[in-house]
């Protein structure tokens, strides 16, 4: 089948199979004109992307990616779709560092900001990390240090083909939700935040068609994170099973707090918050929201029996200095090596 055939099917409201979606993604990256790319993305958006199409496109993106295979298992990622209603501190990034400090092997996938003031690459770059590290260096870092950062444009060069059409369309497309599903290290334990509560069960079901063993897909009342200000909708994925539930701050041993209490700012301001949290200098809601999300990552890594226990282990990682040591290894390697001597 040609790309035109896929466009016609989607335009006529016909859902694409997993393998057809995978092949369509391959054609978008290799042979499509900008008009064809825009036509298929628009047709899928108008029809409504199914979990099977999402999983198939994710497979296609993985096929085109520069991948790594760190000798650590399970591999954890904390990556959200972005595009939520709030500009907060960098929650998933800070949570990844704390989870690694607690013993999880973290393959953090991220990018520069698109919709917010500060994306994961923005804040880590300001903090001193080499966010443009090549795949072999990231693989070695994960094996050696238990954490590495994979910048999306470095690991997904094929995405250049769709940048122009996506900008011209000016609307959300299937690519807005694929980032967390296309970890180049093949992370098999994930905490995925989504901007729309309706996507929680959809991505949960999509993950059962991908090589992910355990995951939490979360939406925190307007946030693509586990929230403190209100309930969080969760789809928990274990193998082929998806269970849905809600949780609150109190259900995982934390105090509720207004969303304004975790507001972020510029990359420089968010980097200061990140440093303050991992060193234990920052307390209150900003620390607590990191504990919530790091606790979830520790849980999916199999290091805790439930999220509340994961929260306790995240707090211990901060209080013992393990999170700080991980931060220094990732973001301030000269400082870390000096302290070790």
UniProtKB/Swiss-Prot annotation:
Its cofactor is Mg(2+). Belongs to the anthranilate phosphoribosyltransferase family. The lineage of its organism: Archaea, Methanobacteriati, Methanobacteriota, Stenosarchaea group, Halobacteria. GO terms for molecular function: anthranilate phosphoribosyltransferase activity; magnesium ion binding. Anthranilate 1 binds at residues 80, 111. Its EC number is 2.4.2.18. The keyword Magnesium applies. It comes from Haloquadratum walsbyi (strain DSM 16790 / HBSQ001). InterPro entries: Anthranilate_Pribosyl_Tfrase (IPR005940), Glycosyl_Trfase_fam3 (IPR000312), Glycosyl_Trfase_fam3_N_dom (IPR017459), Glycosyl_Trfase_fam3_N_dom_sf (IPR036320), Nuc_phospho_transferase (IPR035902). This is Anthranilate phosphoribosyltransferase. It catalyses: N-(5-phospho-beta-D-ribosyl)anthranilate + diphosphate = 5-phospho-alpha-D-ribose 1-diphosphate + anthranilate. It comes from the Archaea. 5-phospho-alpha-D-ribose 1-diphosphate binds at residues 80, 83-84, 88, 90-93, 108-116, 120. Homodimer. The gene is trpD.
């Amino acid at each position: 089948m040609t790309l035109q055939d896929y466009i016609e099917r989607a335009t006529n409201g016909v859902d694409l199979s997993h393998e057809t979606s995978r092949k369509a993604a391959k054609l978008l990256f290799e042979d499509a004109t900008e008009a064809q790319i825009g036509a298929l993305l628009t047709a899928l958006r108008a029809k409504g992307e199914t979990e099977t199409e999402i999983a198939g496109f994710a497979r296609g993106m993985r096929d085109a990616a520069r991948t790594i295979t760190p000798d650590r298992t399970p591999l954890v990622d904390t990556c959200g779709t972005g595009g939520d209603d709030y500009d907060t501190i960098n929650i998933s990034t800070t949570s990844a560092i704390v989870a690694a400090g607690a013993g999880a092997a973290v393959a953090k996938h991220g990018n520069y900001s698109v919709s917010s003031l500060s994306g994961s690459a923005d804040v880590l770059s300001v903090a001193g990390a080499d966010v443009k590290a090549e795949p072999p260096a990231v693989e070695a870092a994960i094996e050696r240090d238990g954490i590495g950062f994979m910048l999306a444009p470095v690991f997904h060069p094929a995405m250049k083909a769709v940048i122009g059409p996506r900008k011209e369309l000016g609307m959300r497309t299937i690519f807005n939700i694929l980032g967390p599903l296309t970890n180049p290290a093949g992370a098999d334990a994930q905490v995925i935040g989504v901007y729309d509560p309706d996507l929680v069960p959809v991505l949960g079901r999509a993950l059962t068609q991908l090589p992910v063993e355990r995951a939490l897909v979360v939406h925190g009342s307007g946030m693509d994170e586990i929230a403190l200000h209100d309930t969080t909708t969760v789809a928990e994925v274990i193998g082929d099973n998806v269970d849905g539930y809600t949780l609150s701050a109190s259900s995982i041993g934390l105090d509720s707090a207004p969303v304004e209490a975790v507001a972020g700012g510029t990359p420089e301001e968010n980097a200061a918050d990140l440093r303050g949290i991992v060193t234990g200098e920052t307390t209150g809601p900003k620390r607590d929201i990191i504990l919530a999300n790091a606790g979830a990552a520790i849980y999916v890594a199999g290091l805790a029996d439930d999220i509340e226990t994961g929260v306790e282990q995240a707090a211990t990682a901060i209080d013992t200095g393990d999170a700080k040591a991980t931060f220094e290894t990732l973001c301030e390697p000269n400082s870390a090596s000096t302290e070790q001597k």
